[in-house]
């Protein structure tokens, strides 16, 4: 599962669109999205309610505590909303130690209310945890002892009996409505492959539940079966995270292939770089370098899997090598070309793309004093490893090559010893 945050606007859109289909509940919520490219005249034509109702406006940027941070404006008319957005659009703010400009807002009707409820659903290994409280709102953390929680195993349905412990202390006049709402939201959660959903708060409007603030995360590995249900969904980067040109290139490459190609720069001046096959193996290599005390020297996180073809691997390896060899400073560097024992991936085929990239970057590798450590197993691995050994002699670049007879992470210690030998 890959949990990806989505904007509040999309969380509410998905809930509104699918709650009726799955639970016969009409959710009368309205919302509009505002960005730098928004034409307010056109927006009002699409959403006429904006000009006739009192409004709420707030950033929709994947960070919380907006109310406590003074970033939520209430009971405004449209002109005031436009002014609020104008004063803050593109302005850098700091949240949770991360700084970034505000680029996206959500605008909604202002809903006066007295009671605030809390609801969250979290997907876990064996089921889902559903939490509910009658004391929702910005002080939910201070009132966490009042939150009721049930765990629902994956194979169990959210029946009225399963929901009953959450709503047992509610007044009778709202208990049934809120119980039906919780079960309906859970149906949407399951059907659309949410991994996390939170409403803090939701309230009651004319006797019907109404989400005021909402967060959602989707399992993006389920996109293949949900693309019609999700519609034009976006998975924004976490607040404060901006892709470098190299990362953007790999991200676009990843979007165009059925394979997985991931690349994140952690420390451009790091001296240990990775190009690892397999999602699990890539994490193990990074963790091992960190556990050995050299996380500060780790230049990147990189992973390729799903049997990418030679051309895709070539383009991928070019980017990794360009970053790994940038700005040589006379000190040794190390590149880990690692992986476990593949089940289906032709090791020789993927290594062919890497070898082509290594040949292209020969002068950069030498200038950066790069030492390369290879460990891999799987179909046709002997041929792939033999090609790597031959390449080392051909280029005059130090390449140490190991097969499945060696431990998977042994090359991490060798890489560290290499870069620290001169210290």
Curated annotation (Swiss-Prot):
GO terms for molecular function: ATP binding; ATP citrate synthase activity. Citrate binds at residues 343, 345, 376. Its main location: cytoplasm. Disulfide bonds: none annotated. Pfam families: Citrate_bind, Citrate_synth_N. It is found in: Cytoplasm, Cytosol. GO terms for biological process: lipid metabolic process. SUPFAM superfamilies: Glutathione synthetase ATP-binding domain-like, Succinyl-CoA synthetase domains. The keyword Lipid metabolism applies. One of its GO terms (cellular component) is cytosol. Keywords: Acyltransferase, ATP-binding, Cytoplasm, Lipid biosynthesis, Lipid metabolism, Nucleotide-binding, Transferase. It catalyses: oxaloacetate + acetyl-CoA + ADP + phosphate = citrate + ATP + CoA. It is an enzyme of class 2 (transferase). Its EC number is 2.3.3.8. Belongs to the succinate/malate CoA ligase beta subunit family. ATP citrate-lyase is the primary enzyme responsible for the synthesis of cytosolic acetyl-CoA, used for the elongation of fatty acids and biosynthesis of isoprenoids, flavonoids and malonated derivatives. May supply substrate to the cytosolic acetyl-CoA carboxylase, which generates the malonyl-CoA used for the synthesis of a multitude of compounds, including very long chain fatty acids and flavonoids. In contrast to all known animal ACL enzymes having a homomeric structure, plant ACLs are composed of alpha and beta chains. Heterooctamer of 4 alpha and 4 beta chains. This is ATP-citrate synthase alpha chain protein 3. It comes from Oryza sativa subsp. japonica. The lineage of its organism: Eukaryota, Viridiplantae, Streptophyta, Embryophyta, Tracheophyta.
């Amino acid at each position: 599962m890959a949990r990806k945050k989505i904007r509040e606007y999309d969380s509410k859109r998905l809930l509104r669109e699918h709650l009726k289909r799955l639970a016969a509940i009409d959710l009368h919520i309205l919302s509009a999205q505002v960005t730098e490219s928004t034409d307010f005249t056109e927006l009002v034509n699409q959403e006429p309610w904006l000009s006739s109702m009192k409004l709420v406006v707030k950033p929709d940027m994947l960070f919380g505590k907006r109310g406590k941070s003074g970033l939520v404006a209430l009971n405004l008319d449209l002109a005031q909303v436009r002014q609020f957005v104008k004063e803050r659009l593109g302005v850098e703010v700091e949240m949770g130690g991360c700084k970034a400009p505000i680029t996206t807002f959500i605008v909604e009707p202002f809903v006066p209310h007295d009671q605030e409820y809390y609801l969250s659903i979290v997907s876990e290994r064996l089921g889902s945890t559903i939490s509910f409280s009658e004391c929702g709102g910005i002080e939910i953390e201070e009132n966490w002892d009042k939150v009721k929680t049930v765990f629902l195993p994956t194979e169990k349905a959210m029946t009225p009996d399963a929901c009953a412990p959450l709503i047992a202390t509610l007044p009778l006049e709202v208990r049934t409505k809120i119980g039906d709402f919780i079960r309906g939201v859970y149906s949407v959660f399951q059907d659309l492959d949410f991994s996390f959903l939170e409403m803090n708060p939701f309230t009651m409007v004319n006797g019907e539940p109404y989400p005021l603030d909402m967060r959602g995360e989707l399992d993006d590995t389920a996109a293949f079966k949900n693309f019609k249900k999700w519609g034009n969904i976006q998975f924004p980067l976490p607040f404060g995270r901006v892709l470098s040109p190299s990362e953007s290139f790999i991200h676009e490459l990843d979007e165009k292939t059925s394979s997985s190609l991931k690349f994140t720069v952690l420390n451009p001046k790091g001296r240990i770089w990775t190009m690892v096959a397999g999602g699990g193996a890539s994490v193990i290599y990074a963790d091992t370098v960190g556990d050995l005390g050299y996380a500060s020297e780790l230049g990147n996180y990189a992973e390729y899997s799903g049997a990418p073809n030679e051309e895709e691997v070539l383009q991928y390896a070019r980017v990794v090598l360009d970053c790994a060899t940038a700005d040589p400073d006379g000190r040794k560097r190390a590149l880990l070309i690692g992986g476990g024992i593949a089940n289906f991936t032709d090791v020789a085929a993927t290594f062919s793309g890497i070898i082509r990239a290594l040949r292209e970057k020969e002068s950069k590798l030498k200038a950066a004093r790069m030492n390369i450590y290879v460990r891999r197993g799987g179909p046709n691995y002997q041929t792939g490893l033999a090609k790597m050994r031959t390449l080392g002699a051909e280029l005059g670049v130090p390449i140490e090559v190991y097969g499945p007879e060696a431990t998977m992470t042994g090359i991490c210690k060798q890489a560290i010893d290499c870069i620290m030998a001169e210290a």
